[in-house]
UniProtKB/Swiss-Prot annotation:
EC number from the UniProt entry: 4.2.3.5
InterPro entries: Chorismate_synth (IPR000453), Chorismate_synth_AroC_sf (IPR035904), Chorismate_synthase_CS (IPR020541)
Organism: Pseudomonas paraeruginosa (strain DSM 24068 / PA7) (Pseudomonas aeruginosa (strain PA7))
Residue positions binding NADP(+): 48, 54
Name this protein carries in UniProt: Chorismate synthase
């Protein structure tokens, strides 16, 4: 069965290719009565769109979203919300010379074997261009969650060898890297400038945090909250790893260090990333994403053609030297979609559950 839909109650179905006429999405299950306009979605789309700095692809797409259905007089109706973003700056001729070649580390080879036919222009459906619809859908989820006091935010925590310490959220929206440390921006810019001169690319690490999440979200056993987050975040193009909380660092931790002890004043740590037993604890939800270097570089590489013959590949076109630079809004969107879906599932089964134990504050 095709995998173009995510969610159980709050569902997102997307369609469209990198060089097709448009991208579309159907968002179903959004509760009625939410005030919603195209501008609510456009804010996050503008954070993701290409061509916003010299460090990203120079493809110029306005990414202007149209709401086709599901909203009447400025409020959601509870019916499916149709979204559309038109592609306006395709240069398909850049790919005509490689239509019978497989770009190394791209999805060309695997799409060819899976479907027997593929849209070679810019990667077609496998292109990160598709993530624009995730961001649009995620903006709907973020707005609904915000009305409940839940805020989802992200930032870049590492670019290549450069680790970026968290200093302030205020810095994140003031630079092209979503860096929480303004003092690191000149170093990041210099690194990217040299990378472009080297005709190479680099990976990155993104951290995404949800605050205000109540205890109880997550559906053990198979739909645990951390499992659903890993599923959603790993579905983002170029993501090769996901950590929740301390993640792989917990391998070197002792139990006395890793366990998040409880006091009447709150948890003393958050190594679990806000999730215990697959269920939200009320602490901030923290996830980290590892994104690989983009494979579209002008440095020649070995590959084969559709006949299996060896070729030397030089990938032309307009590409991101670091896909992680624009990944923060995408990661936020996917976390928000997961949280709203889990919130609606919790509401559907356990809305009447009441316990006397107080909810511990976030530290």
């Amino acid at each position: 069965m095709s995998g173009n839909t995510y969610g159980k109650l709050f569902t997102v179905t997307s369609a469209g290719e990198s060089h097709g006429p448009a991208l579309v999405a159907i968002v179903d299950g959004c509760p009625p009565g939410l005030e919603l306009s195209a501008q609510d979605l456009q804010r996050d789309l503008d954070r993701r769109k290409p061509g916003t700095s010299r460090h990203t692809t120079q493809r110029q797409e306005a990414d202007e979203v149209e709401i086709l259905s599901g909203v009447f007089e400025g409020r959601t109706t509870g019916t499916p919300i149709g979204l559309l973003i038109r592609n306006t700056d395709q240069k398909s001729k850049d790919y005509s010379a490689i239509k019978d070649l497989f770009r190394p580390a791209h999805a060309d080879y695997t799409y060819h074997h899976k479907y027997g036919v593929r849209d070679y222009r810019g990667g077609g459906r496998s292109s990160a261009r598709e993530t624009a619809m995730r961001v649009a859908a995620g903006a709907i989820a973020k707005k609904y969650l915000a009305g409940l006091g839940i805020r989802v935010r992200g930032y870049m925590s590492q670019l290549g060898p450069i680790e970026i310490p968290f200093k302030t959220w205020d810095s994140v929206e003031r630079n092209a890297f979503f860096s929480p440390d303004p003092d690191k921006v000149p170093e990041l810019e210099a690194y990217m400038d040299q990378l472009r001169r080297d005709q190479d690319s680099i990976g990155a690490k993104i951290t995404v945090v949800a605050e205000g999440v109540p205890p109880g979200l997550g559906e053990p056993i198979f739909d645990r909250l951390d499992a659903e987050l890993a599923h959603a975040l790993m579905s983002i193009n170029a993501v090769k790893g996901v950590e929740i909380g301390a993640g792989f660092a917990s391998i070197a931790q002792r139990g006395t260090e890793h366990r998040d002890e409880l006091t009447p004043q709150g948890f003393l740590s958050n190594n679990a990333g806000g999730i215990l037993g697959g269920i939200s604890s009320g602490q901030p939800i923290v996830a980290h994403l590892a994104l690989k270097p983009t494979s579209s570089i002008t440095t020649p590489g070995r590959s084969i053609d559709t006949a299996g013959e060896p070729v030397d590949m030089i990938t032309k076109g307009r590409h991101d030297p670091c896909v992680g630079i624009r990944a923060t809004p995408i990661a936020e969107a996917m976390m928000a979609i997961v949280l709203l879906d889990q919130l609606l599932r919790q509401r559907g089964q356990n809305a009447d559950v009441r316990v006397d134990t107080p909810i511990l504050p976030q530290l």
